[in-house]
Amino acid sequence: MPVHDEQEHEVYGGEIPEEEEGEMDTEEYEEHGGEEGAAAGDEELEPGSSSRDLEDMKKRIKEIEEEAGALREMQAKAEKDMGASQDPSGGVSAAEKEEVDSRSIYVGNVDYACTPEEVQQHFQSCGTVNRVTILTDKFGQPKGFAYVEFVEVEAVQNSLILNESELHGRQIKVSAKRTNVPGMRQFRGRGRPFRPMRGFMPGVPFYPPYAYGRVPRFRRPMRYRPY
């Protein structure tokens, strides 16, 4: 009998947790309002998380656009500064450019290793040198000629004396700088000039219709002779 009581006690004690767990699940289920309450809770969580992600994405896109705008401004400023440094005569009128060209000379056959300071020293005796420009290609390599701008107009004639003088062991070519007029080409004088009309045209030689073979005979027409 004592054994039987213990067995019944053990069986009864093992069923208690199952009932308590079921009661707790039921209470939690009722507190959330059943299936509708659980679904409503999920719907309240999902829109909140997605809206936060959307706000973060918009904020990041705005930051990227601001960075791109700042980069474009820096690039435009750098290109503007570079263009101004490469073209010192930018924004100058045609009259001012012509006046500057009247005080400038062209120097050809310049050694590639020659520096602007050496060119300035070479023409220092002709007058006050204002600027020396050695032209380069897109790779930064010298093209072999330069322009020298003086302060005085008379220095141009004085510099022509140094034509075919030696600089870095090479004979340089010195000439006055010409002003390039847009849309016009200067005639270089090479070849024969164009003649719009010719005063004399030779006659066309006559060739017989039968150049080869037997020449046909042409008979006189027969006249009527009654006697």
Swiss-Prot record:
Q: Which CDD domains match?
A: RRM_II_PABPs
Looking up Pfam families in the UniProt record yields: RRM_1
Task: Please give the residue ranges the record annotates as the region Necessary for homooligomerization.
Answer: 90-227
Q: Where is this region: Disordered?
A: 1-99
Q: Where in the cell is it found?
A: Nucleus speckle; Cytoplasm
Q: Where is the composition biased (Acidic residues)?
A: 16-30
Single GO MF descriptor: RNA binding
Keyword entries, A-Z: Coiled coil, Cytoplasm, mRNA processing, Nucleus, RNA-binding
Q: Which Gene3D superfamilies match?
A: 3.30.70.330
Q: Where is this motif: Nuclear localization signal?
A: 176-183
GO CC terms on record?
A: cytoplasm; nuclear speck
Sorted alphabetically, the Gene Ontology BP terms of this entry are:
mRNA processing
- InterPro entries hit by this protein: Nucleotide-bd_a/b_plait_sf, RBD_domain_sf, RRM_dom
Where this protein primarily resides, as one coarse class?
nucleus
Q: In what ranges is there compositional bias, type Basic and acidic residues? A: 1-12
Residues annotated as coiled-coil are: 48-83
- Protein origin, superkingdom: Eukaryota
Q: Which residues form the RRM domain?
A: 103-179
Q: What does the domain comment read?
A: The RRM domain is essential for the recognition of specific adenine bases in the poly(A) tail, but not sufficient for poly(A) binding.
Role summary: Involved in the 3'-end formation of mRNA precursors (pre-mRNA) by the addition of a poly(A) tail of 200-250 nt to the upstream cleavage product. Stimulates poly(A) polymerase (PAPOLA) conferring processivity on the poly(A) tail elongation reaction and also controls the poly(A) tail length. Increases the affinity of poly(A) polymerase for RNA. Binds to poly(A) and to poly(G) with high affinity. May protect the poly(A) tail from degradation.
The entry describes its oligomerization and partners as:
Monomer and homooligomer. Binds RNA as a monomer and oligomerizes when bound to poly(A). Forms a complex with cleavage and polyadenylation specificity factor (CPSF) subunits FIPS5, PABN3 and PAPS4. Interacts with CSP3.
The protein, known as: Polyadenylate-binding protein 1
Q: From what organism does this protein derive?
A: Arabidopsis thaliana (Mouse-ear cress)
- Classification of source organism: Eukaryota, Viridiplantae, Streptophyta, Embryophyta, Tracheophyta
